[in-house]
Amino acid sequence: MQINFSFGVDVYQRQLSNLSVHIMHHKGPIILAGDFNAWSRPRVNVLKRFARRLRLKEVIFDNDWRTKAFGKPLDYIFYRGLSLNKAEVLITDASDHHPLIATFY
């Protein structure tokens, strides 16, 4: 599913709401990762509410080298039904986003 770029939060919230329908009905572990385009405080708030409502935990990176826009990280990993073992951000010039790596058990 694609979370499109738009300036308002209404479309963003609707897209995440559409995604939440699928996640709510999923039985078993979940890993949800990608570029969420959460480049503003209102978008970050919508994304965090989305994750809380679905009981998704956010992967926290000790050395947070995630790609940012306007000081906000764009890329996230959320999970449920798993335990986080390790998380890191690789620094590379192979893409305009640094890869996020997380291992779970």
Model regions: which residues?
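Active-site regions of metal-assisted phosphoester/phosphodiester hydrolases
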Residues: 1-105
